[in-house]
Amino acid sequence: PVVSIALLGEEEETNQARSLLRLDMFRSRKIFESLLQDPSREAKVLKWCDEYPDRAPASIMPMLPLYNEEGDRFSVLVMELLRHYGDQEEVLSLLGSSLGTDSWSGSIIARYEKQLSCVSQLMDHPREAVRVWARRTQSSLKEKIKRETNTDQERSALYR
């Protein structure tokens, strides 16, 4: 209940709690990942979103594990939020923002390709807003891959 109030509240007291949660989004995401190993917890998150459909899905999206265990698809929770709330612009915007929150070393191309693979799976999504978001994001990722490929080639040529 306390976290729900912090994530959903609109009063000044809840803004401080939200700020604290946002200060360490990486740790928050890791906490949610560990909590969501139990399928009943997943159902509770979805129920909470159903109880507060105008605010909860967007509040929780930045803290969800993005990918399944194999890393080749979006997580079940992300897909469920898109299925139920994918017409909410803020949900889609926050999913896009979450794509840039993981860390990497070396060439970033593999990371973009992983994201592109997951986003491409949304091209036939039942919600039009999700399909539009996926097309736009897919185009952006392809451009980033192209740009980074050129950068990697230039960097490689410098060190020959």
Descriptions of predicted regions:
Residues 1-160:
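Non-catalytic all-alpha helical scaffold/repeat segments
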